Amino acid sequence: MSEVSSAPVRRPFHRRRKTCPFSGANAPRIDYKDVRLLQRYISERGKIVPSRITAVSQKKQRELAQAIKRARFLGLLPYVVA
């Protein structure tokens, strides 16, 4: 006969989703000239950090990526940090 362990079953940990830092009343605007804001969403190697890490909404992530690319094109941000 097989005996089943009667250990309590643990539910998987569910992390609460963070809110988007660009939504809300006094949220900062995404602007390609605001280099200090854009640098918070770029890794130390110069890559754009994904929204699952920064908790930015899908719409704002696209705006953020476009602003970072514009700033790179104008020479305000580096493409790659060596």
UniProtKB/Swiss-Prot annotation:
Top-rank lineage group of the source organism: Bacteria
Keywords, comma-separated and alphabetical: Ribonucleoprotein, Ribosomal protein, RNA-binding, rRNA-binding
A GO term, aspect molecular function: small ribosomal subunit rRNA binding
A single GO BP: translation
Record-level GO cellular component terms: cytosolic small ribosomal subunit
SUPFAM superfamilies according to UniProt: Ribosomal protein S18
Transmembrane domains' residue ranges: none
A Pfam family matched in the record: Ribosomal_S18
Subunit annotation: Part of the 30S ribosomal subunit. Forms a tight heterodimer with protein bS6.
Function in brief: Binds as a heterodimer with protein bS6 to the central domain of the 16S rRNA, where it helps stabilize the platform of the 30S subunit.
HAMAP family with a match to the protein in the record: Ribosomal_bS18
NCBIfam families: S18
UniProt record similarity statement: Belongs to the bacterial ribosomal protein bS18 family.
Entry protein name: Small ribosomal subunit protein bS18
Gene: rpsR
